[in-house]
Amino acid sequence: MAKKADLSVKSERDKYWNDKAVQVFKGRRIVSVRYMGDLEAEENMWSKRGLVLKLDNGMTVIPGMDDEFNDTGVLHYVNAEGQWDCLPSL
């Protein structure tokens, strides 16, 4: 049985979350992209409408403003020329 990560230790916490991100995203393909509707935001008591990404394995990804998902978040990206941009919450 593998040792459970001690998340109070920075190196173990970093490895745990990096491994989790790899498990969730590596090799996945985004099959649809949209902004959530007003009703979806209202049902979650959010003041803004965020992006909704659907992956090829059925998983839905919604950027959040914090770990408690108090509202939707933005998605920053860097293009091939190194220019930063952002897809905002609306």
Residue ranges, per PLM feature:
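Surface-exposed, interaction-prone regions used to assemble/regulate multi-protein complexes
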Residues: 2-90
